[in-house]
Protein backbone atom coordinates (compact mmCIF):
# COMPACT_ATOMS: atom_id res chain seq x y z
CA UNK A 1 0.00 0.00 0.00
CA UNK A 2 1.43 3.29 -1.08
CA UNK A 3 0.76 6.47 1.00
CA UNK A 4 0.46 9.81 -0.69
CA UNK A 5 2.37 12.52 1.27
CA UNK A 6 -0.26 15.15 0.47
CA UNK A 7 -3.02 12.92 1.87
CA UNK A 8 -1.04 12.39 5.07
CA UNK A 9 -0.54 16.15 5.56
CA UNK A 10 -4.27 16.81 4.91
CA UNK A 11 -5.20 14.12 7.42
CA UNK A 12 -2.89 15.62 10.09
CA UNK A 13 -4.26 19.13 9.43
CA UNK A 14 -7.88 17.98 9.77
CA UNK A 15 -7.10 16.12 13.02
CA UNK A 16 -5.38 19.22 14.46
CA UNK A 17 -8.30 21.49 13.51
CA UNK A 18 -10.77 19.07 15.16
CA UNK A 19 -8.85 19.06 18.46
CA UNK A 20 -10.10 22.54 19.46
CA UNK A 21 -7.38 23.28 22.02
CA UNK A 22 -8.21 26.48 23.89
CA UNK A 23 -5.00 28.16 24.98
CA UNK A 24 -5.01 30.57 27.92
CA UNK A 25 -2.23 32.91 28.96
CA UNK A 26 -2.20 33.73 32.66
CA UNK A 27 0.20 34.84 35.33
CA UNK A 28 0.48 32.07 37.91
CA UNK A 29 2.59 31.54 41.02
CA UNK A 30 3.06 29.07 43.87
CA UNK A 31 2.47 29.44 47.62
CA UNK A 32 5.79 29.22 49.52
CA UNK A 33 4.46 29.79 53.06
CA UNK A 34 1.24 30.59 54.96
CA UNK A 35 1.35 32.34 58.36
CA UNK A 36 -1.56 34.06 60.16
CA UNK A 37 -3.44 34.96 56.98
CA UNK A 38 -0.30 36.12 55.14
CA UNK A 39 0.83 34.10 52.11
CA UNK A 40 4.24 34.39 50.48
CA UNK A 41 3.91 33.56 46.79
CA UNK A 42 6.73 32.78 44.33
CA UNK A 43 6.21 33.85 40.71
CA UNK A 44 3.47 36.34 39.71
CA UNK A 45 6.01 38.55 37.94
CA UNK A 46 3.36 40.87 36.45
CA UNK A 47 1.26 41.43 39.60
CA UNK A 48 0.06 44.95 40.52
CA UNK A 49 0.12 46.54 43.98
CA UNK A 50 -3.32 45.97 45.54
CA UNK A 51 -4.36 43.42 42.88
CA UNK A 52 -6.81 40.64 43.76
CA UNK A 53 -5.25 37.16 43.68
CA UNK A 54 -7.15 33.90 43.30
CA UNK A 55 -6.25 31.08 45.70
CA UNK A 56 -7.78 27.55 45.63
CA UNK A 57 -11.49 27.19 46.62
CA UNK A 58 -12.28 30.68 45.22
CA UNK A 59 -10.46 32.37 48.11
CA UNK A 60 -9.43 35.96 47.39
CA UNK A 61 -6.13 37.52 48.43
CA UNK A 62 -4.66 41.00 48.11
CA UNK A 63 -1.09 41.63 46.90
CA UNK A 64 0.51 44.11 49.33
CA UNK A 65 4.28 43.44 49.25
CA UNK A 66 5.99 43.22 45.85
CA UNK A 67 9.52 41.94 46.46
CA UNK A 68 12.34 40.84 44.14
CA UNK A 69 11.56 37.12 44.10
CA UNK A 70 8.21 36.81 45.93
CA UNK A 71 4.90 38.53 46.65
CA UNK A 72 3.46 39.07 50.15
CA UNK A 73 -0.33 38.68 49.98
CA UNK A 74 -3.00 38.95 52.66
CA UNK A 75 -5.88 36.45 52.46
CA UNK A 76 -9.40 37.87 52.77
CA UNK A 77 -11.33 35.34 54.81
CA UNK A 78 -10.52 31.72 55.70
CA UNK A 79 -6.94 30.63 54.99
CA UNK A 80 -6.54 27.30 56.81
CA UNK A 81 -7.15 25.23 53.63
CA UNK A 82 -4.26 26.96 51.77
CA UNK A 83 -1.03 24.95 51.83
CA UNK A 84 2.51 25.19 50.47
CA UNK A 85 2.68 24.47 46.73
CA UNK A 86 -0.89 25.63 45.96
CA UNK A 87 -1.29 27.57 42.69
CA UNK A 88 -2.13 31.30 42.83
CA UNK A 89 -3.48 33.26 39.83
CA UNK A 90 -3.50 36.97 39.05
CA UNK A 91 -6.98 38.31 38.30
CA UNK A 92 -5.92 41.61 36.70
CA UNK A 93 -8.50 43.41 38.90
CA UNK A 94 -8.21 45.84 41.79
CA UNK A 95 -10.44 45.14 44.82
CA UNK A 96 -14.00 46.41 44.33
CA UNK A 97 -17.15 46.54 46.46
CA UNK A 98 -20.82 46.87 45.44
CA UNK A 99 -22.28 50.40 45.74
CA UNK A 100 -25.70 51.98 45.33
CA UNK A 101 -29.01 52.66 47.09
CA UNK A 102 -29.74 48.90 47.19
CA UNK A 103 -27.32 48.64 50.15
CA UNK A 104 -29.45 50.93 52.37
CA UNK A 105 -30.97 49.11 55.32
CA UNK A 106 -28.49 46.23 55.09
CA UNK A 107 -25.52 44.95 57.13
CA UNK A 108 -22.54 43.93 54.98
CA UNK A 109 -18.94 42.83 55.54
CA UNK A 110 -15.80 44.59 54.26
CA UNK A 111 -16.29 43.05 50.78
CA UNK A 112 -19.91 44.23 50.54
CA UNK A 113 -21.36 40.74 51.06
CA UNK A 114 -24.59 40.66 53.14
CA UNK A 115 -24.25 39.19 56.66
CA UNK A 116 -27.72 40.03 58.02
CA UNK A 117 -29.49 36.91 56.69
CA UNK A 118 -31.87 38.91 54.48
CA UNK A 119 -30.76 37.38 51.19
CA UNK A 120 -28.56 38.70 48.35
CA UNK A 121 -28.20 42.39 47.47
CA UNK A 122 -28.80 43.09 43.78
CA UNK A 123 -26.59 46.12 43.23
CA UNK A 124 -26.03 47.38 39.69
CA UNK A 125 -22.60 48.93 40.23
CA UNK A 126 -19.27 48.19 41.89
CA UNK A 127 -16.44 50.61 42.63
CA UNK A 128 -12.79 50.48 43.73
CA UNK A 129 -12.22 50.60 47.48
CA UNK A 130 -9.02 52.65 47.06
CA UNK A 131 -9.67 55.92 45.22
CA UNK A 132 -7.93 59.26 44.91
CA UNK A 133 -9.62 62.05 46.91
CA UNK A 134 -11.19 64.98 44.98
CA UNK A 135 -8.66 67.68 44.07
CA UNK A 136 -8.59 71.30 45.24
CA UNK A 137 -10.50 72.61 42.19
CA UNK A 138 -13.32 70.06 42.64
CA UNK A 139 -14.00 71.09 46.24
CA UNK A 140 -16.36 73.68 47.67
CA UNK A 141 -16.23 75.34 51.07
CA UNK A 142 -18.34 73.88 53.88
CA UNK A 143 -21.48 76.00 54.33
CA UNK A 144 -24.39 73.68 55.18
CA UNK A 145 -24.94 72.20 58.65
CA UNK A 146 -25.14 68.58 59.76
CA UNK A 147 -27.53 68.78 62.72
CA UNK A 148 -26.58 66.15 65.30
CA UNK A 149 -29.52 66.99 67.57
CA UNK A 150 -27.15 67.28 70.55
CA UNK A 151 -27.23 70.73 72.18
CA UNK A 152 -23.60 70.64 73.29
CA UNK A 153 -22.33 69.86 69.77
CA UNK A 154 -24.66 71.97 67.61
CA UNK A 155 -24.15 75.02 69.84
CA UNK A 156 -20.41 74.78 70.63
CA UNK A 157 -18.73 72.54 68.01
CA UNK A 158 -21.02 72.67 64.95
CA UNK A 159 -20.39 70.23 62.12
CA UNK A 160 -20.81 71.13 58.43
CA UNK A 161 -21.52 68.92 55.43
CA UNK A 162 -18.19 67.77 54.01
CA UNK A 163 -16.29 68.26 57.29
CA UNK A 164 -14.17 65.68 59.18
CA UNK A 165 -14.90 65.99 62.91
CA UNK A 166 -13.00 63.64 65.22
CA UNK A 167 -14.72 62.13 68.28
CA UNK A 168 -11.96 61.24 70.75
CA UNK A 169 -11.98 59.88 74.29
CA UNK A 170 -11.22 56.94 76.57
CA UNK A 171 -13.25 53.74 76.45
CA UNK A 172 -16.76 53.98 77.92
CA UNK A 173 -17.14 57.75 77.52
CA UNK A 174 -20.05 57.67 75.04
CA UNK A 175 -18.21 58.05 71.71
CA UNK A 176 -20.44 55.62 69.80
CA UNK A 177 -23.54 57.13 71.44
CA UNK A 178 -22.71 60.58 70.00
CA UNK A 179 -22.17 59.14 66.50
CA UNK A 180 -25.34 57.00 66.59
CA UNK A 181 -27.41 59.99 67.78
CA UNK A 182 -26.04 61.98 64.82
CA UNK A 183 -27.21 59.19 62.45
CA UNK A 184 -30.66 59.02 64.09
CA UNK A 185 -31.09 62.80 63.73
CA UNK A 186 -30.61 62.66 59.91
CA UNK A 187 -34.10 61.19 59.47
CA UNK A 188 -35.99 63.26 56.89
CA UNK A 189 -32.99 65.51 56.21
CA UNK A 190 -31.86 63.82 52.97
CA UNK A 191 -28.53 62.61 54.37
CA UNK A 192 -27.54 58.98 53.72
CA UNK A 193 -25.47 57.36 56.48
CA UNK A 194 -22.76 54.69 56.60
CA UNK A 195 -21.75 53.18 59.95
CA UNK A 196 -18.44 51.28 59.83
CA UNK A 197 -17.84 49.06 62.87
CA UNK A 198 -14.16 48.04 63.08
CA UNK A 199 -12.96 45.42 65.57
CA UNK A 200 -15.99 45.70 67.86
CA UNK A 201 -17.78 42.89 69.67
CA UNK A 202 -20.48 41.34 67.46
CA UNK A 203 -23.01 41.90 70.29
CA UNK A 204 -22.23 45.65 70.33
CA UNK A 205 -22.75 45.89 66.55
CA UNK A 206 -26.03 43.95 66.86
CA UNK A 207 -27.24 46.41 69.54
CA UNK A 208 -26.46 49.41 67.31
CA UNK A 209 -28.27 47.81 64.33
CA UNK A 210 -31.28 46.96 66.52
CA UNK A 211 -31.49 50.52 67.84
CA UNK A 212 -31.16 52.05 64.35
CA UNK A 213 -33.94 49.72 63.13
CA UNK A 214 -36.23 50.56 66.08
CA UNK A 215 -35.86 54.30 65.46
CA UNK A 216 -36.35 54.02 61.68
CA UNK A 217 -32.77 55.02 60.84
CA UNK A 218 -31.82 51.86 58.92
CA UNK A 219 -33.93 53.06 55.95
CA UNK A 220 -31.15 55.50 55.00
CA UNK A 221 -28.16 53.70 56.59
CA UNK A 222 -25.64 51.04 55.52
CA UNK A 223 -23.78 49.17 58.27
CA UNK A 224 -20.34 47.81 57.32
CA UNK A 225 -19.26 45.36 60.02
CA UNK A 226 -15.79 43.88 60.61
CA UNK A 227 -16.13 42.50 64.12
CA UNK A 228 -13.30 41.44 66.45
CA UNK A 229 -13.65 37.84 65.20
CA UNK A 230 -12.86 38.87 61.60
CA UNK A 231 -9.32 38.77 60.21
CA UNK A 232 -7.03 41.80 60.48
CA UNK A 233 -7.28 42.25 56.69
CA UNK A 234 -11.08 42.63 56.83
CA UNK A 235 -10.81 45.14 59.71
CA UNK A 236 -8.22 47.13 57.75
CA UNK A 237 -10.29 47.18 54.54
CA UNK A 238 -13.73 47.85 56.07
CA UNK A 239 -13.14 51.62 56.45
CA UNK A 240 -12.20 51.99 52.76
CA UNK A 241 -15.18 49.86 51.68
CA UNK A 242 -17.57 52.03 53.72
CA UNK A 243 -16.00 55.19 52.30
CA UNK A 244 -16.57 53.96 48.72
CA UNK A 245 -20.24 53.27 49.54
CA UNK A 246 -20.57 56.84 50.90
CA UNK A 247 -18.79 58.33 47.88
CA UNK A 248 -21.46 56.86 45.59
CA UNK A 249 -23.93 59.41 47.05
CA UNK A 250 -21.40 62.28 47.23
CA UNK A 251 -20.47 61.98 43.55
CA UNK A 252 -24.13 62.09 42.48
CA UNK A 253 -24.98 65.36 44.22
CA UNK A 254 -26.34 63.83 47.44
CA UNK A 255 -25.20 64.29 51.04
CA UNK A 256 -23.77 61.41 53.07
CA UNK A 257 -22.44 60.93 56.61
CA UNK A 258 -19.92 58.21 57.53
CA UNK A 259 -18.92 57.08 61.01
CA UNK A 260 -15.68 55.09 61.50
CA UNK A 261 -15.98 53.29 64.84
CA UNK A 262 -13.08 53.21 65.46
CA UNK A 263 -9.85 54.05 63.62
CA UNK A 264 -7.60 52.99 66.54
CA UNK A 265 -8.60 49.37 65.92
CA UNK A 266 -8.06 49.83 62.18
CA UNK A 267 -4.50 51.09 62.85
CA UNK A 268 -3.86 48.09 65.14
CA UNK A 269 -5.10 45.70 62.40
CA UNK A 270 -2.85 47.42 59.84
CA UNK A 271 0.10 47.20 62.26
CA UNK A 272 -0.51 43.45 62.60
CA UNK A 273 -0.57 42.97 58.80
CA UNK A 274 2.57 45.11 58.33
CA UNK A 275 4.56 43.25 60.98
CA UNK A 276 3.55 39.88 59.51
CA UNK A 277 4.65 41.15 56.09
CA UNK A 278 8.04 41.96 57.71
CA UNK A 279 7.79 45.69 57.05
CA UNK A 280 10.09 47.71 59.34
CA UNK A 281 8.30 48.98 62.47
CA UNK A 282 8.51 52.59 63.67
CA UNK A 283 7.07 54.49 66.67
CA UNK A 284 4.84 52.28 68.89
CA UNK A 285 5.64 49.45 66.39
CA UNK A 286 3.36 51.06 63.78
CA UNK A 287 4.65 51.01 60.18
CA UNK A 288 6.00 54.19 58.60
CA UNK A 289 2.87 54.80 56.50
CA UNK A 290 0.25 54.74 59.29
CA UNK A 291 -0.33 58.49 58.81
CA UNK A 292 -1.04 57.88 55.11
CA UNK A 293 -3.37 55.03 56.10
CA UNK A 294 -5.72 57.54 57.74
CA UNK A 295 -5.04 60.65 55.63
CA UNK A 296 -5.95 58.98 52.33
CA UNK A 297 -9.17 57.71 53.94
CA UNK A 298 -10.28 60.97 55.58
CA UNK A 299 -9.34 63.19 52.62
CA UNK A 300 -12.07 61.42 50.64
CA UNK A 301 -14.65 63.11 52.89
CA UNK A 302 -15.29 66.47 51.21
CA UNK A 303 -17.88 68.79 49.76
CA UNK A 304 -17.63 68.73 45.96
CA UNK A 305 -18.90 71.50 43.68
CA UNK A 306 -21.68 71.35 41.08
CA UNK A 307 -19.20 71.17 38.16
CA UNK A 308 -17.61 68.02 39.62
CA UNK A 309 -21.03 66.37 40.07
CA UNK A 310 -22.17 67.37 36.57
CA UNK A 311 -18.96 66.02 35.02
CA UNK A 312 -19.11 62.79 37.05
CA UNK A 313 -22.75 62.10 36.09
CA UNK A 314 -22.20 63.16 32.42
CA UNK A 315 -24.70 66.02 32.80
CA UNK A 316 -27.46 63.90 34.41
CA UNK A 317 -27.27 65.91 37.67
CA UNK A 318 -26.92 69.69 37.34
CA UNK A 319 -26.62 72.48 39.91
CA UNK A 320 -26.20 70.18 42.93
CA UNK A 321 -23.19 69.89 45.20
CA UNK A 322 -22.39 66.60 46.92
CA UNK A 323 -20.82 65.97 50.30
CA UNK A 324 -19.40 63.19 52.45
CA UNK A 325 -19.06 64.13 56.13
CA UNK A 326 -16.80 61.93 58.27
CA UNK A 327 -17.02 61.31 62.02
CA UNK A 328 -13.93 59.22 62.82
CA UNK A 329 -13.69 57.87 66.37
CA UNK A 330 -10.38 57.42 68.22
CA UNK A 331 -9.99 55.65 71.57
CA UNK A 332 -7.32 57.03 73.89
CA UNK A 333 -5.56 55.36 76.84
CA UNK A 334 -6.02 57.29 80.12
CA UNK A 335 -6.74 60.52 78.23
CA UNK A 336 -3.40 60.52 76.40
CA UNK A 337 -4.16 62.50 73.23
CA UNK A 338 -0.44 62.90 72.47
CA UNK A 339 -0.01 59.23 71.47
CA UNK A 340 0.92 58.45 67.86
CA UNK A 341 -2.45 57.64 66.24
CA UNK A 342 -4.51 60.32 68.11
CA UNK A 343 -2.08 63.12 67.12
CA UNK A 344 -2.09 61.89 63.52
CA UNK A 345 -5.88 61.95 63.23
CA UNK A 346 -6.20 65.28 65.11
CA UNK A 347 -3.88 66.86 62.53
CA UNK A 348 -5.85 65.38 59.59
CA UNK A 349 -9.37 66.33 60.76
CA UNK A 350 -11.14 69.72 60.84
CA UNK A 351 -11.76 69.71 64.57
CA UNK A 352 -12.33 67.34 67.48
CA UNK A 353 -14.87 66.59 70.18
CA UNK A 354 -13.10 65.52 73.41
CA UNK A 355 -15.10 63.25 75.70
CA UNK A 356 -13.84 62.94 79.29
CA UNK A 357 -14.21 60.09 81.78
CA UNK A 358 -14.53 62.47 84.77
CA UNK A 359 -17.43 64.36 83.19
CA UNK A 360 -19.10 61.10 82.13
CA UNK A 361 -18.86 59.70 85.67
CA UNK A 362 -20.19 63.00 87.06
CA UNK A 363 -23.35 62.48 84.99
CA UNK A 364 -22.59 65.10 82.31
CA UNK A 365 -23.61 63.18 79.18
CA UNK A 366 -22.59 63.72 76.42
CA UNK A 367 -19.31 64.20 78.34
CA UNK A 368 -17.94 66.95 76.09
CA UNK A 369 -15.06 69.09 77.34
CA UNK A 370 -16.03 72.52 75.97
CA UNK A 371 -12.60 74.04 76.60
CA UNK A 372 -10.58 71.85 74.22
CA UNK A 373 -13.26 70.70 71.75
CA UNK A 374 -13.16 72.74 68.53
CA UNK A 375 -14.70 72.82 65.08
CA UNK A 376 -12.36 74.51 62.61
CA UNK A 377 -14.83 74.98 59.75
CA UNK A 378 -18.27 74.25 61.19
CA UNK A 379 -18.91 77.85 62.33
CA UNK A 380 -19.53 78.87 58.71
CA UNK A 381 -22.14 76.11 58.40
CA UNK A 382 -23.98 76.64 61.69
CA UNK A 383 -27.77 77.12 61.55
CA UNK A 384 -28.57 80.87 61.77
CA UNK A 385 -30.74 80.73 64.87
CA UNK A 386 -28.28 78.49 66.78
CA UNK A 387 -25.37 80.75 65.76
CA UNK A 388 -27.22 83.81 67.11
CA UNK A 389 -28.02 82.18 70.44
CA UNK A 390 -24.99 79.99 71.16
CA UNK A 391 -22.26 82.67 71.40
CA UNK A 392 -22.36 82.97 75.18
CA UNK A 393 -22.73 79.26 75.96
CA UNK A 394 -19.18 78.20 75.19
CA UNK A 395 -17.65 81.16 77.05
CA UNK A 396 -19.93 80.60 80.05
CA UNK A 397 -18.92 76.94 80.26
CA UNK A 398 -15.18 77.50 79.77
CA UNK A 399 -15.11 80.30 82.39
CA UNK A 400 -17.23 78.23 84.78
CA UNK A 401 -14.78 75.29 84.64
CA UNK A 402 -11.86 77.63 85.43
CA UNK A 403 -13.69 79.48 88.21
CA UNK A 404 -15.01 76.26 89.75
CA UNK A 405 -11.43 75.09 90.32
CA UNK A 406 -10.55 78.35 92.17
CA UNK A 407 -13.85 78.48 94.04
CA UNK A 408 -12.97 75.29 95.92
CA UNK A 409 -10.24 77.21 97.78
CA UNK A 410 -11.93 80.60 98.17
CA UNK A 411 -14.30 81.08 101.10
CA UNK A 412 -15.76 84.50 100.22
CA UNK A 413 -16.56 85.13 96.54
CA UNK A 414 -17.70 88.46 95.12
CA UNK A 415 -21.20 88.76 93.65
CA UNK A 416 -20.11 88.69 89.96
CA UNK A 417 -18.07 85.49 90.44
CA UNK A 418 -20.90 83.83 92.35
CA UNK A 419 -23.37 84.72 89.58
CA UNK A 420 -21.03 83.33 86.94
CA UNK A 421 -20.66 80.07 88.87
CA UNK A 422 -24.44 79.77 89.24
CA UNK A 423 -24.99 80.43 85.52
CA UNK A 424 -22.25 77.89 84.66
CA UNK A 425 -23.94 75.20 86.77
CA UNK A 426 -27.20 75.73 84.91
CA UNK A 427 -25.55 75.76 81.48
CA UNK A 428 -23.74 72.50 82.37
CA UNK A 429 -27.06 70.98 83.44
CA UNK A 430 -28.75 72.19 80.24
CA UNK A 431 -26.07 70.53 78.09
CA UNK A 432 -27.04 67.13 79.49
CA UNK A 433 -29.16 65.07 77.12
CA UNK A 434 -30.57 61.55 77.12
CA UNK A 435 -29.31 59.06 74.54
CA UNK A 436 -31.42 58.47 71.38
CA UNK A 437 -33.31 61.75 72.04
CA UNK A 438 -31.91 64.26 69.51
CA UNK A 439 -33.57 67.69 69.52
CA UNK A 440 -35.07 69.66 66.65
CA UNK A 441 -33.76 73.15 65.85
CA UNK A 442 -36.69 74.99 67.49
CA UNK A 443 -36.31 72.98 70.74
CA UNK A 444 -32.62 73.83 70.87
CA UNK A 445 -33.32 77.51 70.07
CA UNK A 446 -35.88 77.80 72.88
CA UNK A 447 -33.49 76.27 75.45
CA UNK A 448 -30.54 78.46 74.37
CA UNK A 449 -32.68 81.61 74.36
CA UNK A 450 -33.99 80.84 77.85
CA UNK A 451 -30.54 80.23 79.38
CA UNK A 452 -28.97 83.28 77.65
CA UNK A 453 -31.68 85.58 78.99
CA UNK A 454 -31.49 84.35 82.57
CA UNK A 455 -34.79 82.44 82.73
CA UNK A 456 -33.01 79.51 84.42
CA UNK A 457 -31.07 81.65 86.92
CA UNK A 458 -33.68 81.52 89.70
CA UNK A 459 -34.38 77.79 89.26
CA UNK A 460 -32.72 75.10 91.30
CA UNK A 461 -30.12 73.21 89.22
CA UNK A 462 -32.02 69.90 89.60
CA UNK A 463 -35.13 71.46 87.99
CA UNK A 464 -33.40 72.79 84.84
CA UNK A 465 -34.07 69.77 82.59
CA UNK A 466 -37.66 69.39 83.83
CA UNK A 467 -38.28 73.10 83.10
CA UNK A 468 -36.79 72.65 79.61
CA UNK A 469 -39.04 69.65 78.86
CA UNK A 470 -42.11 71.50 80.15
CA UNK A 471 -41.24 74.57 78.07
CA UNK A 472 -40.94 72.45 74.90
CA UNK A 473 -44.36 70.84 75.53
CA UNK A 474 -45.87 74.28 76.26
CA UNK A 475 -44.51 75.76 73.01
CA UNK A 476 -45.62 72.73 70.97
CA UNK A 477 -49.19 72.82 72.29
CA UNK A 478 -49.87 76.59 72.48
CA UNK A 479 -47.42 78.22 70.05
CA UNK A 480 -47.40 75.75 67.14
CA UNK A 481 -47.19 78.51 64.49
CA UNK A 482 -44.08 80.03 66.17
CA UNK A 483 -42.47 76.58 66.37
CA UNK A 484 -43.23 75.93 62.67
CA UNK A 485 -41.75 79.32 61.64
CA UNK A 486 -38.47 78.78 63.54
CA UNK A 487 -38.18 75.22 62.19
CA UNK A 488 -38.83 76.36 58.61
CA UNK A 489 -36.68 79.53 58.47
CA UNK A 490 -33.98 78.23 60.90
CA UNK A 491 -33.79 81.87 62.03
CA UNK A 492 -35.23 84.10 64.76
CA UNK A 493 -36.74 87.38 63.53
CA UNK A 494 -37.47 90.27 65.93
CA UNK A 495 -41.19 89.42 65.96
CA UNK A 496 -40.47 85.74 66.63
CA UNK A 497 -38.01 86.70 69.38
CA UNK A 498 -40.68 88.81 71.09
CA UNK A 499 -43.18 85.96 70.73
CA UNK A 500 -40.67 83.47 72.15
CA UNK A 501 -39.92 85.75 75.11
CA UNK A 502 -43.65 86.12 75.83
CA UNK A 503 -44.14 82.34 75.55
CA UNK A 504 -41.30 81.60 78.00
CA UNK A 505 -42.60 84.20 80.49
CA UNK A 506 -46.12 82.82 80.12
CA UNK A 507 -44.86 79.29 80.88
CA UNK A 508 -42.71 80.47 83.78
CA UNK A 509 -45.72 82.14 85.42
CA UNK A 510 -47.85 79.03 85.13
CA UNK A 511 -45.18 76.39 85.87
CA UNK A 512 -44.80 75.16 89.42
CA UNK A 513 -41.05 75.25 90.07
UniProtKB/Swiss-Prot annotation:
Membrane topology: Peripheral membrane protein
InterPro entries reported in the protein's UniProt record: ATP_synth_asu-like_sf, ATP_synth_asu_C, ATP_synth_asu_C_sf, ATP_synth_F1_a_nt-bd_dom, ATP_synth_F1_asu, ATPase_a/bsu_AS, ATPase_F1/V1/A1_a/bsu_N, ATPase_F1/V1/A1_a/bsu_N_sf
Positions bearing the site annotation: Required for activity: 373
Entry's localization field: Cell membrane
Catalytic class of the enzyme: translocase
Pfam families, alphabetized: ATP-synt_ab, ATP-synt_ab_C, ATP-synt_ab_N
Major localisation: membrane
Protein name: ATP synthase subunit alpha
Species whose genome carries this gene: Polynucleobacter asymbioticus (strain DSM 18221 / CIP 109841 / QLW-P1DMWA-1)
Gene for this chain: atpA
Amino acid sequence: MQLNPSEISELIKSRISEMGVDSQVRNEGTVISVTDGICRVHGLSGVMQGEMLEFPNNTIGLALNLERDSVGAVVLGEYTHIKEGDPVKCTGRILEVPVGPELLGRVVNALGQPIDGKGPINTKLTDFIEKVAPGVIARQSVSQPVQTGLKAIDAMVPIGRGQRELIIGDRQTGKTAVAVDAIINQKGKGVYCVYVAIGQKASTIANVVRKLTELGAMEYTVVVAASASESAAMQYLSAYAGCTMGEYFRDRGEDALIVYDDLTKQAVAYRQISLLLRRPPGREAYPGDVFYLHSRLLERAARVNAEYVEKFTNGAVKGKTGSLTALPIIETQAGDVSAFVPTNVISITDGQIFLETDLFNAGVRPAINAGISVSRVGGAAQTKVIKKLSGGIRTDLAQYRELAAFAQFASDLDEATRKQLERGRRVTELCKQAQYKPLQVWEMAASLYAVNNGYFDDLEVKNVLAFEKGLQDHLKSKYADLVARIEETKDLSKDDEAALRAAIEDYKRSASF
